[in-house]
Structure formats: structure tokens, C-alpha cells
């Protein structure tokens, strides 16, 4: 039975002349993808109409995996193989990840970035993030009807070089061309500014699942200038969950170390649900039955929760004060405060922001979607889809100073924090000893004065310096930061012209060979993924055809004689029985049989409709 496909207004594929690009918010708790369609940025939903994809991946044996909602629902029954909040691990070693000791995972000793052992092998945070990004890419291509030319992916403003590079590697592994990495508060400002025609000084308070950012922006006639940025890449909604989790355990006289991993995950899920419920209700219940048979039942009031998390709320105000000082403005100068991130729905956060800035925060845009919407606008522009009203300029900044190690383990800052990017700065250095023919250059990031207190980004050597007395050689070191906030360093000896350079790829243990291996692994599972996709498509088409045929039989079953009706009923029953199975070829064959078996029925229905439409009308009226 042939179908006529009609798109809802605004849901048709983009015109062929537009280059399809999307904005992706790769979040700690949830992720989403957005695109500009008919000049309006919108979040793209999945088949069930949900725009948020839980940032959860469950690994199964034999290469299987669950991603998003399905994985989240199974986290409590298989916590060791279900990776949540992976964004906290990006570009980080185990010692740098807060709460790693309480996580249910088996961590693997590896240089640099932490690794997690699963039933499907050892996985890096880059691989886990790539699964999420690939799912969003597929959603976008299915919705938009064509391949993507690229994506703008958002990152916390306070992400350092290692975390940014890890994000780009994950995108590359997911088959995405990264047009730009965009700071999340800046993306929110783009969405808010363009949507509201806002001008003046604005603060963007971004509290997500695992990170906190505070940016001060100046919006003037299409120019988005970031004046200062601050934050904490290890503070987010997850920390509020863990505080409440510890409180519930303490009230019950239990310790986390004594719980089974399944119970830890289950209780964390219940606690998170209670936290979210407290945003709308004065109290919430936590009811859990542990694997030991013990039951926990507690009532949490909003006041109790507010008192419990007050230290975390105050932690967000420290970077806020610092950013205001860096921008040389006061809280009274701020015209509006834009809230970003699901954690900002908590009344305790909104009350604290309102009190600090002396005004209620702006909440007219969905805090879960605003970052992705802004990224979509930037992606559309970078893809070349410029229209008359798109003449605007984005001036972003680097969140942390970039420097070089000098004698004594000191840091000489080359590019100070809050410098507008892209940017290049140079400084001259000299040799320390007579006859010195080489110089080791150690690139660091941070605000501290000692190298040991900053993050090491890269090391390289400049060799071939002509032997001279100490202090005679002149070595010019140039730091260059691109629009993604990623760094390249060049060194040149001025007398001889010898030079060396490095594109900083942080030492988190993921090299080109690792990327190649991961890509090869993804190719190996591509056939399995395609088979799963084909089966799902066959099941959906079968269900659609069964429902359409049954509706037609109810409306016009009298057009068939008893024998014909029996044949159609048998075809419908056969397809309905096969549809839930896992044989895509059999489902396709049954679908084709039903479609062909109802062709004559469809023709009779068409004749009936035409006769009904023409009944009582004269020839000259037609």
C-alpha cells in the first residue's frame, strides 16, 4: 500500500543549497544537538521526541553497547560497565578526578588520562564520549536528511588544553568535522543575545552536571566580547548529588564503602530524583531497597538541602568575584544574568545568584538547550550559510594563562588569561651557560608562579644554537592560540635562524596510533551497527504498515469479499508476528507481501473516494 509522505511545516529537509552544520552540547549529564532550520535554531529530537540524550554509555560483551536513555535505565543493574558523567574524566588522570575512589569502575593504570575496564575491553573517556557524539551525529543526519559538513562543539570555558584536545579527538573518532570548539557561556550569550537583541554587560552563570563557568560578556550591536571568564572544571550538579547521597547514608548509619556498586548507583539515582523534585516541591522522599534487603526511607526538605549544599553554592561565587575583578566591573554594572545548565533550576542557586547580583536571573530560555542553540547559530555561520542579518562578531578568550618554564622552576607567562582569541604573543629568552647549544622548552598552563603548581602541556627542544657566552643568544618563543583555544609554540634562535615548533597535544596518553586503533575498532563494529539500524528501520516500517492497514480495514473493509479479507488478515497477522523479531530480511519480505497484497484494496478505496467527491456534481462543474 503506497503512502504519501507529508512533512509538517518547518520539518522538511533543509534546501540543498544550504551546508548542513550543527551545534552540539556535550554535557556531563545530558547532551543534545541543534541546527538552524528556516533561520531558527532548534534542538533536534530523537524518534520519541526527546531532545536530551543522557550522557551514559553501557558496554556489553561481544561489542554491544547501549547509549543514552537505554543505558541510563540499566545503570543500577550494571554500574561497572555503565559509564556516566564521563566529561569529568576528559583529559584527566585518575589522581585529578574528584570522587574517583567512590566510583564503581575498575580504573586501569595508564599514563595521563584515566582508563576504565569494561566487559568490552579497556575504554578511554575519549572513546566513551565518541559514542555519545556519534549518536547525536546520526540523529542530526537522519533528521536533516543529509551528511553534515561539520559541527561546533561546546566546552566549559574553564576547560584546559588537555580537555579541549580530548574533546576534539572524541569528535574525530565519531566522524565529525569540528568547525570550532566554543565556550559554553559564549554559546549561551549568542543564543540569548540574538534572540533578545540584548546589549550591555551580561554575566553567564553556567552550572552543569560536572563543571561551573562564569563569564562576563559585553554585547553591543552584533559584537559578543568576552571580558573575563572564571570557573571550576570539577564542580557541578553531580557534587550536589553526592552531598545529598552522603547525608542520606549518614542518617541511616551507613557508609558508601560498605555498599555494593549496584546499591551505590541505585541510591544515587534516587537522590538525584529527590534533588530535582525539590526544585518544584518543598520536600521530597528517598525510598530505596538495597540488595541486602535493607530499606532506606527518608524525607528531605528544601531547607535541609539548601543548608547542606551551601558550601558548594559559595564555591561558585569565588570564581564569580574573580571574573568581575578581571573584567574591572562590579555586580551592579551587570545588566542581566543568564542561567545555563540543568543545575541552575535549583532554587538555592537562583536565590544565591539573585542575592549576589541584586536582580533575579534571566530564565526565559531553557537552560538545558540554550548552549546547543548558540552553537547551532555559530555552526550555521561557519558553514557559510550567511544571511543579511548574520553580521556579528565573536570575541572569545582563553580561561588560563599560558607560560614557559624558566630557570628555577618558575613560570614566565607569555599569554595572560582572558586574552581575546585567536592570539599570538612572543617573548625573547637567552642561554644560561657558556657554550650552551640547546634549550629545553617546557610549556605550562595556569596562574601559579611555580611550574610544579601548573599543568604541563608539552616539552620540546631547540637544538643547533651557536656556542656563545651565556646571555648572548636570543631565542624568540612565540605562542599562538587558535579560535578553538588550542595552542602551538614556535622557538627561533635569532642569530642562526634555527627553529623548532610543537602543536601542543597534551600528554594524556592518546596519540595518533591510539586514534587510529579506535577508528579501526569503530570500523569493525560498523557492520554490527548497520545491521542493528536496518532491523530497527524494518520494524518501524512494519509497525506503520500494520497500523495503516488495520485502519483502512475498519473504514472500508466492506470493499473486500470474504476470501480477500481473509488473505489480508493473514498477511497482517504474519507481519505483526515477525515485527518484534530480529530477522530484518524476513520483516522486509513480510512488509513487501502486505504492501503488494493490499494494492487492489488501495485502488478500490481511491475509486470510492473519487466517486464520493464527484457525487451530485455536473460535468461542467468539474
UniProtKB/Swiss-Prot annotation:
**GO: which molecular function terms?**
ATP binding; ATP hydrolysis activity; ATP-dependent protein folding chaperone; unfolded protein binding
Where does the source fall among the domains of life? Bacteria
Which one Pfam family would you cite for this protein? HSP70
Q: Which Gene3D superfamilies match?
A: 1.20.1270.10, 3.30.420.40, Actin, Chain A, domain 4, Substrate Binding Domain Of DNAk, Chain A, domain 1
* InterPro entries noted in UniProt: ATPase_NBD (IPR043129), Heat_shock_70_CS (IPR018181), HSP70_C_sf (IPR029048), HSP70_peptide-bd_sf (IPR029047), Hsp_70_fam (IPR013126), ISC_FeS_clus_asmbl_HscA (IPR010236)
Q: Give the SUPFAM superfamilies listed for this entry.
A: Actin-like ATPase domain, Heat shock protein 70kD (HSP70), C-terminal subdomain, Heat shock protein 70kD (HSP70), peptide-binding domain
Q: PROSITE patterns in the record, alphabetically?
A: HSP70_1 (PS00297), HSP70_2 (PS00329), HSP70_3 (PS01036)
Q: Which keywords are on file for this protein?
A: ATP-binding, Chaperone, Nucleotide-binding
Kindly indicate whether the keyword ATP-binding belongs to this entry: yes
What biological function has been recorded for the protein in this entry?
Chaperone involved in the maturation of iron-sulfur cluster-containing proteins. Has a low intrinsic ATPase activity which is markedly stimulated by HscB.
List the PANTHER family. Answer: HEAT SHOCK PROTEIN 70KDA
Q: What family does the database annotate? A: Belongs to the heat shock protein 70 family.
| HAMAP family linked to this entry | HscA (MF_00679)
Q: What is this protein called?
A: Chaperone protein HscA homolog
Q: Which organism is it from?
A: Burkholderia pseudomallei (strain 668)
From the broadest rank down, the organism's phylogenetic lineage runs: Bacteria, Pseudomonadati, Pseudomonadota, Betaproteobacteria, Burkholderiales
Gene from which the chain derives: hscA
Amino acid at each position: 500500500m503506497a503512502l504519501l509522505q507529508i512533512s509538517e511545516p518547518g520539518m522538511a529537509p533543509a534546501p540543498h543549497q544550504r551546508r548542513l552544520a550543527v551545534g552540539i552540547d556535550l554535557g556531563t549529564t545530558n547532551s543534545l544537538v541543534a541546527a538552524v532550520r528556516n533561520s531558527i535554531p532548534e534542538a533536534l529530537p530523537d524518534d520519541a521526541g526527546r531532545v536530551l540524550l543522557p550522557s551514559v554509555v553501557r558496554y556489553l560483551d561481544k561489542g554491544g553497547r547501549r547509549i543514552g536513555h537505554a543505558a541510563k535505565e540499566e545503570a543500577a543493574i550494571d554500574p561497572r560497565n555503565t559509564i556516566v558523567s564521563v566529561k569529568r574524566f576528559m583529559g584527566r588522570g585518575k589522581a585529578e578526578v574528584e570522587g574517583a575512589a567512590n566510583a564503581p569502575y575498575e580504573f586501569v593504570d595508564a599514563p595521563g588520562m584515566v582508563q576504565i575496564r569494561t566487559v568490552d575491553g579497556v575504554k578511554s573517556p575519549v572513546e566513551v564520549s565518541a559514542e555519545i557524539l556519534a549518536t547525536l551525529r546520526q540523529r542530526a543526519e537522519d533528521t536533516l536528511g543529509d551528511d553534515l559538513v561539520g559541527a561546533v562543539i561546546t566546552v566549559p570555558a574553564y576547560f584546559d588544553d588537555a580537555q579541549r584536545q580530548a574533546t576534539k579527538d572524541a569528535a574525530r573518532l565519531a566522524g565529525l568535522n569540528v568547525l570550532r570548539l566554543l565556550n559554553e557561556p559564549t554559546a549561551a550569550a549568542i543564543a540569548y543575545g540574538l534572540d533578545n537583541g540584548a546589549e550591555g554587560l551580561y554575566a553567564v552563570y553556567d552550572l552543569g552536571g560536572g563543571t561551573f563557568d562564569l563569564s562576563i560578556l559585553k554585547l553591543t550591536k552584533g559584537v559578543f566580547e568576552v571580558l573575563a571568564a572564571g570557573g571550576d572544571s570539577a564542580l557541578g550538579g553531580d557534587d550536589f548529588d553526592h552531598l545529598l547521597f552522603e547525608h542520606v547514608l549518614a542518617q541511616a548509619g551507613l557508609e558508601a564503602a560498605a555498599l555494593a556498586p549496584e546499591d551505590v548507583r541505585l541510591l544515587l539515582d534516587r537522590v538525584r530524583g529527590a534533588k530535582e523534585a525539590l526544585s518544584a516541591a518543598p520536600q521530597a522522599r528517598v525510598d530505596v531497597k538495597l540488595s541486602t534487603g535493607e530499606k532506606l526511607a527518608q524525607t528531605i526538605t528544601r531547607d535541609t538541602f539548601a543548608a547542606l549544599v551551601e558550601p558548594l553554592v559559595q564555591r561558585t561565587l569565588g570564581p564569580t568575584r574573580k571574573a568581575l575583578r578581571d573584567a574591572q566591573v562590579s555586580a551592579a554594572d551587570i545588566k542581566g544574568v543568564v542561567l545555563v545548565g540543568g543545575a541552575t533550576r535549583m532554587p538555592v542557586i537562583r536565590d544565591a545568584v539573585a542575592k549576589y547580583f541584586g536582580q533575579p536571573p534571566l530564565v526565559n530560555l531553557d537552560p538545558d538547550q540554550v548552549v546547543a542553540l548558540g552553537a547551532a547559530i555559530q555552526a550555521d555561520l561557519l558553514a557559510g550559510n550567511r544571511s543579511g542579518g548574520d553580521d556579528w562578531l565573536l570575541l572569545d578568550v582563553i580561561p588560563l594563562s599560558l607560560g614557559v618554564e624558566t630557570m628555577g622552576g618558575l613560570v614566565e607567562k607569555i599569554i595572560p588569561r582572558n586574552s581575546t582569541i585567536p592570539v599570538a604573543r612572543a617573548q625573547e629568552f637567552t642561554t644560561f651557560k657558556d657554550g650552551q647549544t640547546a634549550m629545553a622548552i617546557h610549556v605550562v598552563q595556569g596562574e601559579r608562579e611555580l611550574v610544579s603548581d601548573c599543568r604541563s602541556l608539552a616539552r620540546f627542544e631547540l637544538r643547533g644554537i651557536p656556542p656563545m657566552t651565556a646571555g648572548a643568544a636570543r631565542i624568540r618563543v612565540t605562542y599562538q592560540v587558535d579560535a578553538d583555544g588550542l595552542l602551538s609554540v614556535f622557538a627561533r634562535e635569532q642569530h642562526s635562524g634555527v627553529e623548532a615548533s610543537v602543536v601542543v597535544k597534551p600528554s594524556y596518553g592518546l596519540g595518533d596510533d591510539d586514534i587510529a586503533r579506535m577508528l579501526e575498532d569503530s570500523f569493525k563494529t560498523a557492520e554490527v551497527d548497520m545491521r542493528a539500524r536496518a532491523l530497527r528501520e524494518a520494524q518501524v516500517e512494519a509497525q506503520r504498515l500494520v497500523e495503516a492497514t488495520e485502519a483502512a480495514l475498519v473504514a472500508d473493509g466492506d470493499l473486500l469479499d470474504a476470501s480477500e479479507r481473509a488473505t489480508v488478515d493473514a498477511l497482517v497477522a504474519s507481519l505483526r508476528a515477525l515485527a518484534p523479531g530480529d530477522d530484518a530480511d524476513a520483516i522486509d519480505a513480510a512488509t513487501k507481501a502486505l504492501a503488494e497484497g493490499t494494492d487492489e484494496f488501495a485502488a478500490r478505496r481511491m475509486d470510492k473516494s473519487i466517486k464520493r467527491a464527484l457525487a451530485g456534481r455536473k460535468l461542467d462543474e468539474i
